[in-house]
C-alpha cells in the first residue's frame, strides 16, 4: 500500500505546484485618489456639515464586519442627512478594513471640505459620502483607471478577446453574489506568448444583480477608451471595480479570511468519520478512508441532486403560482420572470420591518390594499404594499408590477426593491418616498403654498421624462393606463416618480402599434381618455391625455372631477373651464393664486401644452416625444388647441360603451372605473 501513498502525494504536488509557481507578491499600491464631485456645496455651519462630522467621528468605534461592507448615515429626517458607504477588497483582514475606512473618511473630508458628494479610493478600500441616499443605487461616475506593464502589440485581438471573456464570466458570478458579497476571482485560458490571465471583479453588495451587472458592463465598455490591450489594468467607480493581470495577484480562496462558518452539528458524518479513524491502526485507517470517502461523496452527490430537483420543482410551482393567467403570461412573461427571483423577500423580514404591519406605520389605503412604512435591519427605509387577499384584480396588479418594474430603471419611476408571496399574502416592496403623493400637495390649500413655479415646472418635466421612457426608451413599450395625481410620488427633493403599474400594458418595442382594444376598462374617472373610457381603445395617446390633465391640475391646483366645483364654475368640469378661459383670453384667471412668482409666459405655455394633450381626438394629441420637445424648446411653435374631451354633451359617458364590456362600476370616492370579465 506504500505506493498508493506515494502516488497520492505526487498527485497533490502536481495539482498545487503550478499555482505556487506562478504566485507572486502583490506590490499593488497607489496613492489615494480623491474625487470631490461637483454636485453642490454646503456651508461649514450647516446641518449637513454637523451630520457629516458626526458620521466620520462615529467611525472611531466602527466594529469590524465579515464582508467588508459598511452602510452608514447620520441625522434625522429634516432633509440634511449624511449618507456614506465603505467597501474593502476581498482579501483585506477585518481590522485592516476598518482602519482603512477610518483613514479614508478623515482624509476625504479634509480634501473635500465643503463638497456634498465625494469619493476616495485607497489601495485596500473605498469610501464615499453624499447628501442623498446612495444605498442600493448604482453610481458609475467618477471613475479611475490604473495601467501597469506594457501594451500588447502581437496577438492584440486575441488578447482583448480573452481579456473580455474572463471579465464577462466573473461579472456574472459577482452579480449573482447575494446581499452580503458581490465578488469573483478567476483565471482564463492562455494565449500565444502568455501563460494565463487573472482577474477580479467586485460590486458594493447593496446593488441588485442587474445594477451590479450594468455597472461592470459600463466599466468593460470603457476599457478601449483608456487602456485596451494593456497587460495590467485596474478600474474603479463608486459602485464597482475590476482588475486584470497576466500574473496571479490575488490570494487563493483557501488563504482568504473565511466568511462566518455555518454551525456544524456535533454528530455530523465528518465527526463520525474522524472518531472512527482515530480508533484504528495505520493499515485499517487506509482501508476506512478508501471506503468511507467514496461513500460520503456518493451520498453528498445524491443529496445535492435531490435538493436541485426539489428546488427546480418549487421554482416551477412558484413561477406558475405567481404568473397564473396573468395578462403578461406568455412569451414575454416566461422569458423575463427569471430576472425577478433575486427580488424575493421573506415574509418574516417584512413583518419585522413594519412592526407586524402596525397601524402606526400605515401610510395609506387603496382599492387593492394598504401601504406601510418599514425599515430594514441595515437602516434602509421601505414602503410595503400589502395587497388584499380576496382581490382578483389585486393579483393582476401584483403580477404586473413585478414583471414590469423589474425591467425598468429610471429616476422618474418608483423603484421596486422586492416582493413576497406566502400563502394568501401578496406584498410589494418599494423605495420609501418621503413626501407621499402629488395629490396630497396640489389639492391641499396649505401644502400647495410650498410648491412654487420652479418646483411645479420640475414636476411637469419629470413626469414627461418618465412617460417618454415608458413609451419609447425602455426595452418594452409600456402604457400606464392609470396616470393620476395620487400615482405620482414626490421624493425628498420634490422630484416626481411615477408609481402603480398594476393596470399597465406591455408590448414588444419592435411592434408597430397604433391602437389596441381591451374588454377590461379600468382607471380613474377624470383622467381617462374618451376613446378608452367609451370603447376600450388605448394607445400611448391614452397616457398623453392623462398627462395633460395632470399638467392642468398642477397649474390650477384644482381637481378634474368632471362636474365638481371650480370656484364659480359649478356647472363646468376643469378642462372645459380652462379651454373656455383660453378662448376668451382670460386664461390668467385659472392659474393657482398661490403662484405669485414665476414666468407667466412659461406657465401659459404649459397650459397650452396641457390643452393640446387633452384634445378629444387621439390623432390630434402630441406624442410624449413631441411634448418633451415643446417643454424644452421655445422655438417650437405650438398649434392652437381644439376643444378638449368631456365638455358639455360629453360630460356623462354613454351607456352603450362597448359590445365587449359587461359593465362599469364607479365608486363615489375618486370615481375609479373597473370592469369585471364575464364568468
From Swiss-Prot:
Cellular component, GO, one term: vacuole
Ranges in the topological domain labelled Extracellular: 24-286
Subcellular location: Membrane
Glycosylated sites: 41, 45, 71, 107, 131, 187
Active site: 482
PANTHER family xref list: CYSTEINE-RICH RECEPTOR-LIKE PROTEIN KINASE 28-RELATED, RECEPTOR-LIKE SERINE/THREONINE-PROTEIN KINASE SD1-8
Protein name, per record: Cysteine-rich receptor-like protein kinase 29
Species of provenance: Arabidopsis thaliana (Mouse-ear cress)
Gene giving rise to this polypeptide: CRK29
